[in-house]
Amino acid sequence: MTDEEPADRDDDSDSTPELELDAVYDAIDAVGRPHLTATEFSRKTDLTPDEARAALERLADDGDIERQDVSEVESVWYPTDIAEVTDRERVVLFPDRREVVVEHPDQFTRAQLSQFARLQDTNRSGGYVYELREEDIWAAPHESLDDLLTTMRDVLGERSPHLEEWVTSQWERARKFRLKTHEDGYVVLEAESDDLMGNVARPKLDDDHLRAPISDSESWVNEDATAEIKRTLYEAGYPVRDDRDLETGDAIEMDLRLRLRDYQQDWVERFTEQGSGVFVGPPGSGKTVAAMGAMAAIGGETLILVPSRELATQWRDELVRHTSLTDDDIGEYHGGEKEIRAVTIATYRTAGMDRHRKLFDQRKWGLIVFDEVHHVPSPIHRRSADLQTKHRLGLTATPTRESDDEEEIFTLIGPPIGTDWGKLFDEGYVAEPEVEIRLVPWGDETEQSEYSSTSGHDRRQAAASNTGKIDEIRYALAENPAAKALVFIEYLDQGEAISEAIDAPFISGETPHARREKLFDEFRRGELTTLVVSRVGDEGIDLPDAELALVASGLGGSRRQGAQRAGRTMRPAGDARMVILATRGTTEEDFVRRQMRHLASKGIRVTETEAEAVEPPAKTE
């Protein structure tokens, strides 16, 4: 050994690879725990064990990681900020099960996943489980298969030939059948191949659906049966593309008085190209305004279907405010009024009644707008889906129904348009709500004993009506003294008790229409800062300035209602907060967590806290 050798080793030590801290995080992710040994680090990098140890020591000298000796020959290394590791996003793909498990996903990741997968489960430690279903691929809002696969690779961080082969097959499956208009004006069902027509379509469809074969791959369609054809083939696993020439109706003169946002203009252009579709976006994203843009683009007489008279009145007001239409151009058709004009707004219930049906069928509508489109799958509203010869536009933030048949919306109305919520949050068009599940202790032991001794509906009502929630509502309102607040309830007795306790008006289905309108208007103008609202407030009532939504009873609601209630706070400016109260240790806990999955799947972070017992404020003389 020469005298120069030690110096050479010093030079080698100076050339130790300078790795970024992210390399340690990546290695920790790979080993699956928040610490690692130098040997493990070397296996996850291109370094030798000595180089790995030297690199770790350099990071330790810089204060980025810590060292803990666990034996005479071995040490473990971990980041100084251990929380950064435990809260770090991890995406794990299980291609055979078509599942994606994500720990601590950020908003963008959740928004991307929602475009091709369905959130199945969440847990309190920040884990999300997504499932890729056939329906998710069929309805993916992408222009091409390449666009869809690019989104998947971006969020998954890897390519899975097995999964991508399945996705490709489902994407192609959704393009095996299409409806088109023959040059002679009648409707044709076209299959991609003779085998598909002969072995799938014709055995499942009878003479009521198909009039006669045109060729081995084409059949003449009974036009009144187009909705049933779509439904039947969808159930067989073959969604049908609708490329028919749709009716435009008698022309109307209508101009917008405002400029559409870029994404709204994109929605309108995609809709006019397709002839049908569903605008899916968070409340506050301007779906109604975009629908007016679609009305102007189609330029034909328009029928607008809504779930309530209140929403019909709102539509009329917004049309007069934002377009060149006048009151004389707009009719309302429901229990209060029955006028059919160039633009007519009707309730789903009235439009579906036999004695009123001919009035709507005989009018040559160019466009049918289905507001709150999640109503369409309900049996009471199913008739509205039979208006298949028109341009069809659905509007919703939440296509979810508890029966999980939301896919029918996209089959009978059209494919989704504009489903990326995360982009709208990031660009500031919509305020991302802060959603909190707050677990509340019982108000007194008597209520808890009553819950334990009952079952069924009585048990659910006992948990929902826990009087401990009244004190928590007072506390939440005191936390947000300047916020305009909506308190949602499920049971009338509970609503009246809360209304009296916080001195705020209570609006329910029993409230006369005129008084409801008066209270809503006072809330909009800021003359009232708090309202207690039953389910009547869940369907599109325009309360644009609500900053706080308090849900006092979760067991009576659905995932759709949960998203709508959060939507009362999701507006383009200001703070947005939603607090769901659930009685600790009851079935209400798990129900509320399931209820919030839809919001979580759209990129909204849902947190959970334990409420302390709150002493009611002392009464003043």
Curated annotation (Swiss-Prot):
Helicase ATP-binding domain: residues covered: 268-417
Record family assignment: Belongs to the helicase family. RAD25/XPB subfamily.
EC number, UniProt record: 5.6.2.4
One GO MF term: catalytic activity, acting on DNA
UniProt catalytic activity: Couples ATP hydrolysis with the unwinding of duplex DNA by translocating in the 3'-5' direction; ATP + H2O = ADP + phosphate + H(+)
Name under which the protein is recorded: Putative DNA 3'-5' helicase Rad25
S-S bridge residues: none
